[in-house]
Swiss-Prot record:
A single BP term in Gene Ontology: transmembrane transport
Task performed by this protein: Silicon efflux transporter involved in silicon transport in shoots. In the nodes, involved with LSI2 and NIP2-2/LSI6 in silicon intervascular transfer, which is required for the preferential distribution of silicon, such as hyperaccumulation of silicon in the husk. Silicon is beneficial to plant growth and helps plants to overcome abiotic and biotic stresses by preventing lodging (falling over) and increasing resistance to pests and diseases, as well as other stresses.
Identification of the protein by name: Silicon efflux transporter LSI3
Keyword field contains Transmembrane helix: yes
Topology versus the membrane: Multi-pass membrane protein
Family according to the record: Belongs to the arsenite-antimonite (ArsB) efflux (TC 2.A.45) family.
Organism field: Oryza sativa subsp. japonica
Lineage, highest ranks first: Eukaryota, Viridiplantae, Streptophyta, Embryophyta, Tracheophyta
Gene name for this UniProt entry: LSI3
């Protein structure tokens, strides 16, 4: 795309710069309005400066992606109410053989769960569990928090529903769920293993000891303590965390919310429920939540429309709950949806200036994915941009350009270029604390924990995050797209 007129390029760059500044530094002193308002401000400036028309701005908002995000948050809320993440927490503690064993469990469970339930959701729910498990065994919290954050990002790379940038890539590339999964799965598994090995090597001495007796695990003392602390926090301080990238509130755990799907407010239930025992009612609702979620994943693999499949699953859970859905819908992070809407408009306007295309034209000859050098250059560009401009804007800015360049090589190269973009932009989030919303969630959840709080600083993270990101990215790249169907 040719460069637009100079005033349009300048005004578009200013509007995008405002968006970028507030996305990376949401509490900047002279304009502390946050990421969500910053995205809206960027969108408004694009229209006010006549970089993009109002009609084009509306057209740039990707409704299928917003619908999938919304439905995924609703389904995730019901799964938390059904105790899904509490069971994951128990799996971490069950017959633990020491600190190193627990470290491996945190890495594996978090990575696999993040691929299915998004990295942000897993970090919201599992952070306090991990803190409690480490404290019970007199183990340092830092290695486990790093394992949680980095494994969540690596694991989320494997599926289109693992993180927001993968959603964008899946919709724009038209790659099916199963092709996306198989294309990145080998890299994800290798990356998870390498990341786990690096954590063990770096913190081997600190992880000595920490074995848990079978009686203690059977009694479930760890999980009871965590739930008690979280319920106390909910009663003492009912307020929003204010993180636009957090898909659901951390207080939505099973048994901790009187408005949850599993609560027994019998007066609001259907008469059919009145004729059932309390145990059967709860068992039916929980079983239904698990069954329809499995059905949703199967539908994804069969190639059905992901957005409407997720929305259908969400509304099925709402209908079977037999209650006013407002309490459940209130837990959706609407600020995240607004952020995405503003970002779509802002990035679309910036693209219309022609500046991203002009910059890419300079880099394209050195970024061919059919050569090792080209793949290396492209990966470095994606990695740097993902940490400077965040991963979702990077995907929106570079996706079409990278795919167009790959189309001159072969159709298979186009698919591999999208998968490469998904892998590198996701793993790049592990480089620093600011590289991923999941990192910030772990940091804030750990700092605000009612029990065993821990302050994970920027430097604590980057000391491990930098080498891990470089090694995991490099090892995963040759494995991208090796399995085709």
């Amino acid at each position: 795309m040719a460069l637009a007129s100079l005033p349009k390029v300048v005004m578009g760059s200013v509007a995008f710069g405002v968006f970028w500044m507030l996305a990376v530094f949401p509490s900047v002193p002279f304009l502390p309005i946050g990421r969500t308002a910053g995205a809206l401000l960027g969108a408004v400036l694009m229209i006010v400066f006549h970089v993009i028309s109002a009609d084009d701005a509306y057209a740039s908002i990707d409704l299928p992606i917003l619908g999938l995000l919304f439905a995924t948050m609703v389904v995730g809320g019901y799964l938390k109410n059904a105790g899904m993440f509490r069971h994951l927490g128990r799996l971490l503690a069950w017959r633990s053989q020491g600190g190193r064993d627990l470290m491996c469990r945190v890495c594996v469970v978090t990575a696999l769960a993040s691929a299915l339930f998004t990295n942000d959701t897993c970090c919201v729910v599992l952070t306090e569990f991990v803190l409690e498990l480490a404290a019970e065994r007199n183990l340092p919290a830092k290695p486990f928090l790093l394992a949680l954050a980095t494994s969540a990002n690596i694991g989320s790379s494997a599926t289109p529903i693992g993180n927001p940038q993968n959603l964008v890539i899946a919709f724009n590339s038209k790659i099916s769920f199963i092709s996306f999964l198989l294309g990145i799965l080998p890299a994800m598994l290798a990356g998870m293993g390498i990341n786990m090995l690096m954590l063990l090597c770096m913190y081997w001495k600190e992880l000595d000891g920490g074995a848990c007796s079978p009686d203690e695990v059977a009694a479930g003392k760890q999980m009871e303590a965590i739930e008690e602390g979280r319920r106390t926090a909910l009663n003492n301080n009912k307020k929003d965390d204010g993180d636009a990238a957090t898909p659901a509130s951390p207080e939505d755990d099973d048994g901790g919310d009187a408005e949850s799907m599993m609560s027994e407010n019998i007066s609001t239930k259907h008469r059919w429920f009145m004729q059932c025992s309390e145990h059967r009612r709860k068992l039916f609702l929980k079983s239904f939540a698990y069954v329809v979620t499995v059905g949703m994943l199967v539908a994804y693999m069969l190639g059905l429309n992901m957005s409407w499949t997720a929305i259908t699953t969400a509304i099925a859970l709402v209908v079977v709950d037999f209650r006013d859905a407002e309490p459940c819908l209130d837990k959706v992070s609407y600020s995240l949806l607004v952020f995405f809407s503003g970002m779509f408009v802002t990035v679309s306007g910036f693209n219309k200036t022609g500046l991203p295309g002009a910059i890419w034209n300079v880099m394209a000859p050195y970024s061919k994915i059919n050569h090792v050098t080209g793949v290396t250059v492209l990966s470095v560009i994606i990695l740097l941009l993902s940490n400077l401009a965040s991963n979702v804007p990077t995907v929106l800015l570079m996706g079409d350009e990278v795919a167009a360049a790959a189309a001159t090589i072969s159709p298979a190269a186009v698919t591999r270029s999208w998968l490469l973009l998904a892998w590198v932009s996701t793993v790049a989030g592990n480089l620093s604390l600011l590289g991923s919303a999941a990192n910030l969630i772990v940091c804030e959840q750990a700092r605000r924990a009612t029990r065993n709080a821990y302050d994970l600083t920027f430097w604590n993270h980057v000391i491990f995050g930098l080498p891990s990101t470089l090694v995991v990215t490099a090892i995963g790249i040759p494995l991208i797209g090796k399995i085709n169907i």
